[in-house]
Design a protein with these regions (language model features):
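Residue-level detector of well-ordered alpha-helical segments, enriched
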Residues: 64, 85-89, 103, 120-124, ...
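Short Asp/Glu-rich motifs
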Residues: 130-131, 148
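Mid-chain, well-packed structural core segment of small domains
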Residues: 92, 96-122
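Acidic, glycine/proline-rich low-complexity segments that act as flexible tails and inter-domain linkers
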Residues: 2-85, 113, 139-154
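Residues at alpha-helix boundaries and the short loops/turns that link adjacent helices
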Residues: 44-47, 101, 115, 131
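Substrate/cofactor-recognition hotspot
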Residues: 134-138
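Short alpha-helical scaffolding segments that buttress acidic/His motifs in well-ordered protein cores
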Residues: 68-72, 89-96, 124-129
Length: 154
């Protein structure tokens, strides 16, 4: 173990470059899950939620960004049994239940891109009152309404 660490330090000294984190080595030449995940993110969130967000990711946040792109969007959102509209509704229901307004806002935009209507969003929030409680549902309503206003849909 110690020899590996010493070898890395020596390689860095020889090249004069700081070693790049192992998870960033070949991300541009990534596998099918990466490509599929990026395509889903682009379709749902546009360039700001795909390429720009990835390009702006720090080395510290890179493992999370890579994992979410491959596993969440590349492998889960692309499974054939549920379409993206249904997945958006399920995702939003879970985010309301967890009271995560930032993620609700992100996924409201994605839901609209996936064909969810504002009436369906309202119905989802109303339905969540029974299962999640009034405070969480109200937070979901407010967050969704703010996003709809920003998008010119409210």
């Amino acid at each position: 173990m110690m020899a590996k660490a010493a070898k890395k330090k020596t390689a860095a000294k020889i090249s004069g470059k700081k070693p790049r984190p192992h998870w960033k080595k070949d991300w541009k030449n990534a596998n099918k899950a990466w490509d599929d995940g990026l395509a889903v993110r682009r379709a749902m969130f546009g360039p700001a939620g795909a390429e720009k967000q990835i390009a702006d990711t720090s080395d510290f946040m890179w493992p999370m960004q890579d994992y979410v792109t491959r596993k969440c969007f590349g492998e889960t959102w692309t499974r054939p049994l549920l379409n993206r509209k249904t997945r958006s509704l399920i995702t939003l229901a879970m985010l309301v239940a967890m009271a995560r307004p930032h993620e609700i806002a992100v996924h409201v935009r994605g839901a609209i891109a996936n064909g969810v209507s504002k009436e369906e969003l309202s119905e989802l929030m109303l339905h969540s009152i029974i299962y999640c409680g009034i405070p969480k549902a109200v937070e979901g309503f407010r967050t969704a309404q703010g996003v709809l206003k920003d998008m010119g849909l409210e």
